[in-house]
Amino acid sequence: MPFTLHQKDSSTDARLGTLELPHGRVQTPIFMPVGTQGSVKTLHPQDLESLGAQIILGNTYHLSLRPGSGLIREMEGLHRFSSWNRPILTDSGGFQVWSLAKLRKITEEGVRFQNHLDGAYMMLSPERSMEIQADLGSDIAMLFDECPPYPCDRKYAESSLGYTLRWARRCKTWVQEHQPCSGEGRQHHFGIVQGSVYADLRKRCAEELAAMDFDGYAIGGVSVGEPEEEMLRAIDHSA
């Protein structure tokens, strides 16, 4: 994925750059409005453009329920469905599954849970998450991960990290088998660094994900109830 670094702050390592995505350029750092079900509530796509929004976020879990990823695929993707012609990032559904903690069961296969609409049981696996995001046709697809809660003891954090790394490999395999690895318009895939508040686990996760050679990397498992100082340390250990 083309990324041009324009400037880097010597004291903070903050970076100014440009991402080249299938539906346009994104100047970083950037605020990304959340369009859970394909659109940002109360705003028309033209309103977002006039406000300078360069990229929006869509939610894999919610879109898989309503209107369904199959219908969006038939509509030739989320961009056409939502009348948004600029870049879109879709999350993997992992964070929403985390929020349904009382209604879920995590196994090696994936996560079995009850959806919030009618209580029906669903299974979301790494492969299914990537398949849904491929149907949506987003510019950036996030890998399926396990977001540990806060507080979280080390034993749970280690087990959770194992899921995240093994699932990342399965996401990679699915992409290699079902999507082009190069070419104009291809979907880009981002790994998610987990490890709770444990510095060595976050370092391990970042290193192992980097070795898998994804297009980009995100910092996950923050802003889940931890104090601000813990959040800042977790970010520092992950970056």
Where are these regions (language model features)?
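Glycine-rich phosphate/ribose-binding loops and adjacent secondary-structure elements
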Residues: 174, 178, 187-239
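Extracellular/periplasmic catalytic domains that process cell-envelope and extracellular macromolecules
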Residues: 82, 184, 191
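Non-catalytic, usually N-terminal nucleic-acid engagement modules in DNA/RNA processing proteins
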Residues: 1-181
